[in-house]
Amino acid sequence: ESKILTNRNIIQRAKTIMPGLIYDENPYLVIDKDGKLVWVLDAYTVSNDYPYSQRVTIETNGEKREINYIRNSVKVLIDAYDGTTKFYITDRSDPIATAYRNIYPDIFMPKEEEIPADIQAHFVYPKLLYQVQAEVLARYHNVQPEVLCRGDDIWSIASKSVGKTSTKAGTEFEPYYTMVRTIDSEKAELGLVIPYSQFERQNIISYMVGTYSDNGEAKLKIYKFPTDSNILGPMQLDTQLEQTTNIAKEIENLNVNGTSITKNMSIIPIQNTLLYVVPIY
């Protein structure tokens, strides 16, 4: 039987069906227990009218908007072969998602139908939500009212260089997926990572990891280093690398005939240690 399939772009397909949600720009493909390919797309309910809450700016699909409320309350599963699209509400305490279900009962899967466990086992922490949390955490990680008012314990997302340190300004780390094994974890798992420095300083003082448990539960943890620790930040490490004779010579040999040097540093948590990995292109 022949079919004409339209709206084959994963995000546009979901947006056409349910335009009231915000969709992550990073859908991912998983394999279910029967060997079928299924796209997983994280969807969010948002608002900019939540009382007494910090506003942040998000950008999705080229559109910017201010919000002060965001929840990853919906997961969209799309069959990669025939395009069958299913919307699951995963956070039933979210009033916005509940309102959408009441208005559009035929779009969302019935309450009694859960996401298959073999699909849940492949969930990863949603990137857009993580980016918002990382930005807000830089100021609000300290919950002492007097410290918040003074603003003397503010973090900033760590910066790294993408070219030669002497000629390129640092750029903030973007959240990235990597295998992590934190000090309180028994095994390595896929997580989102972002490192922090004290405001206007370069040393690493903490990092945040977002993971999913095997039963589909999102976990977000912050790991702080002692205040007297002196852990090199990415920019400081880059400076050391360029002052190391052998490495500096190799980079100089590559930088000939107009060739540009690009680096993309990653920081990988391994128990109580941070491993810096610096590919050079």
Which residue stretches match the model-derived regions?
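A conserved hydrophobic secondary-structure block that centers on an alpha-helix together
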Residues: E1-S53, R71-S73, D79-Y81
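Hydrophobic alpha-helical scaffolding
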Residues: I4, E63-I67, Q198
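Soluble extramembrane regions of membrane proteins in the secretory/endomembrane system
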Residues: Q12, E66-A121
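Mature hydrolase/peptidase catalytic cores and their serpin-fold inhibitory cores, especially
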Residues: P27-K33, L37-I70, M109, H141, ...
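Beta-sheet entry/capping signal
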Residues: L37-V40, S73-V76, T84-K86, E189-G191, ...
